[in-house]
């Protein structure tokens, strides 16, 4: 399946100059969603992953089905103040700004193998921040999985040493 045909391009969103890659058409199409989940799951099958971590919000949309298929848990990473228990936090750079993320302090057990699943790899700031949170809790990042990669933003360069999968690549 050509997932590129299921990704809607929205110009000047969320701010002027950004060409937003909208994954909601994938979510709407059960065959496209099954294909996406299957491709990520296939990549992870031999990685001995114990848990999937997904950053808010679109990481939830793709990470939970992958965790379900692998019969493992899912741990959310959220914006500050959204998780009810004790958290660890990290500041990170976005393609178009800066932000912070938090994870529950008991979300990852020491020594667990973790795959981080998200919709998009742009500058790499978000996933690098999530990786730092996982490692702060004693987890090992086994894989980084993305539906989309914006290659010209060179996010992959910040993530050397990690196994990276992206299903669709765009040049800007």
UniProtKB/Swiss-Prot annotation:
Assigned EC number: 2.4.2.7
One term under GO cellular component: cytoplasm
NCBIfam families, A to Z: apt, PRK02304.1-2, PRK02304.1-3, PRK02304.1-5, PRK12560.1
Function as written in the Swiss-Prot or TrEMBL entry: Catalyzes a salvage reaction resulting in the formation of AMP, that is energically less costly than de novo synthesis.
Signal sequence annotation: none
Localization of this protein: Cytoplasm
InterPro entries: Ade_phspho_trans, PRibTrfase_dom, PRTase-like, UPRTase/APRTase
Major subcellular site: cytoplasm
Family, as annotated: Belongs to the purine/pyrimidine phosphoribosyltransferase family.
Pathway: Purine metabolism; AMP biosynthesis via salvage pathway; AMP from adenine: step 1/1
Matches recorded under Gene3D superfamilies: 3.40.50.2020
The reaction(s) this protein catalyses: AMP + diphosphate = 5-phospho-alpha-D-ribose 1-diphosphate + adenine
Protein name in UniProt: Adenine phosphoribosyltransferase
Example GO BP: purine ribonucleoside salvage
SUPFAM superfamilies associated with the record: PRTase-like
Subunit structure: Homodimer.
Sections of the chain in a coiled coil: none
């Amino acid at each position: 399946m050509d997932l590129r045909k299921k990704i809607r391009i929205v110009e000047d969103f969320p701010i002027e100059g950004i060409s937003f890659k909208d994954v909601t058409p994938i979510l709407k199409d059960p065959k496209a969603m099954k294909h996406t989940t299957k491709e990520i799951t296939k990549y992870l099958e031999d990685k001995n992953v114990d848990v999937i971590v997904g950053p808010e919000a679109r990481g939830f949309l793709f990470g939970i089905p992958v965790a379900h298929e692998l019969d493992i848990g899912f741990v959310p990473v959220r914006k500050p103040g959204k998780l009810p228990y004790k958290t660890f936090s990290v500041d990170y750079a976005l393609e178009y700004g800066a932000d912070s993320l938090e994870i529950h302090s008991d979300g990852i057990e020491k020594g667990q193998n973790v795959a981080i699943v998200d919709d998009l790899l742009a500058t790499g700031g978000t996933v690098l921040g999530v990786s730092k949170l996982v490692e702060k809790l004693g987890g090992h990042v086994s894989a980084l999985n993305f539906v989309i990669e914006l290659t010209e933003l060179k996010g992959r360069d910040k993530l050397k040493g990690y196994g990276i999968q992206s299903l669709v690549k765009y040049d800007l």
